[in-house]
Amino acid sequence: MATMNLPTGLHVAAKPASLDRLSSAKNVGDLFFSDSRHRKRVNTSNQIMAVQSLEHIHGVNNNVYANYVNFNVPSSGYSLGQESVYLNSPRKTKIVCTIGPSTSSREMIWKLAEAGMNVARLNMSHGDHASHQRTIDLVKEYNAQFEDKVIAIMLDTKGPEVISGDVPKPILLKEGQEFNFSIKRGVSTEDTVSVNYDDFINDVEAGDILLVDGGMMSLAVKSKTSDIVKCEVIDGGELKSRRHLNVRGKSATLPSITEKDWDDIKFGVNNQVDFYAVSFVKDAKVVHELKDYLKSCNADIHVIVKIESADSIPNLHSIISASDGAMVARGDLGAELPIEEVPLLQEDIIRRCQSMQKPVIVATNMLESMIDHPTPTRAEVSDISIAVREGADAVMLSGETAHGKYPLKAVKVMHIVALRTESSLQKSTSSPSQSAAYKSHMGEMFAFHSSSMANTLSTPIIVFTRTGSMAIILSHNRPSSTVFAFTNNERVKQRLALYHGVVPIYMEFSSDAEETFSRAIKLLLSKSLVKDGQYVTLVQSGAQPIWRRHSTHHIQVRKVQS
């Protein structure tokens, strides 16, 4: 059993006569108290805990207020240690939402942000520049209206997709049926449809397995001519217009960045988006090419590589090293590789990103059923929880928010599952990257000890950063508490919205250290992010001195005083 504490302000409805026994307690918010004859119990978000003692109980207007509640948590074989649980603790795992017809209005973007969206994704496979421009303008309007909140913008390139042609009506494919793909444009008959890629003929061989629409249908390649690939249907279904085609175990020989992608990238530069998510990256050369272009444009945009092709797997280390982060795009990854490999690759990619201090996003099918249904499957809930437990910086919604019927419910489900999972994770007084910290530069060593101190003392971390680098290093040390990152750079504030456990806040820095710290604390108090009398760990990186002319690293533990 581990002892935990709830903070001042815990409210339970009950009659004053029941102060000694909470037998008359009722459900209020997410907290429910009940009573047994010998032992009181507390249920927090369906977690049963045994109450040890209640301090400072008093009744006001027939309500009970508990300033402090001590209770035991069933530890399932491990000790959680002494900690303080704050009811308004921010969620650490970030949420990426794809904006589409269901969510492109001003009202919906505001509601998504309030429900928990941290990053707005623009899927360049759909829509045009005019529609995406409206979304960008609305997100920027939101950011300007709420200074203490931020939504980052991610532009996701279409990439080199092999797509079937248009059909006047869906073609029903049946098991055992012969069906053909032609490189001639405009072909559409009951047994043949065109593809948009001339080298498709050269990319496939007899014996290959073609997957249609992410694996919804599959066909075996039997033979080919100069312009037709002849197949036999293995798993049938309805073939509609413009369906994505994959060859299991192979990637198309198309370039990772197409002409359309370059047009979209230029559009992103002009609109100062925060991230590019680059589709079907096969090697680090593509990343270097894009970064060189961005440097020539003086564009401060970070590059997220989407790991979704078979060719990318042997080059994972170099691809992630060259990038600013990665996305586990499980849809095409599961189409090009055996499906049973996807969970293992997800874990491997997350682990690699953590070791390289790069953010990682887990994407595809996370709440797919909520496109049409108001509640998720239990497997989907488990999927989110696993991604959080494995250490993903962010989880992503695609069709759920782009064109789904219940976009807000999907975000709320993702928010509460991530928050609940985070609350169950074992708290540690050490950093997961201790060995790496001692092998690298001073900044990493400094962040490691800052995180360890904050974990030991159960304090939030306040970091002042110009470039965001110290906040990022702190994030990858995975401190148990929140990292409040104050920066005087709006672009840095936007970018930090993606990082695990980081709450970015814009603030002009003063030459007076005490004045800057005082203003930061005042802002956090006003938002109830810290409370009076609480201790905080204050961090300033010597690599980017804020108050001193010379480089100085320092860590302070201070008591919050309003």
UniProtKB/Swiss-Prot annotation:
SUPFAM superfamilies: Phosphoenolpyruvate/pyruvate domain (SSF51621), PK beta-barrel domain-like (SSF50800), PK C-terminal domain-like (SSF52935). The record marks 306 as: Transition state stabilizer. It catalyses: pyruvate + ATP = phosphoenolpyruvate + ADP + H(+). Mg(2+) binds at residues 308, 332. It comes from the Eukaryota. GO terms for cellular component: chloroplast stroma; cytoplasm. Belongs to the pyruvate kinase family. This is Pyruvate kinase isozyme G, chloroplastic. The lineage of its organism: Eukaryota, Viridiplantae, Streptophyta, Embryophyta, Tracheophyta.
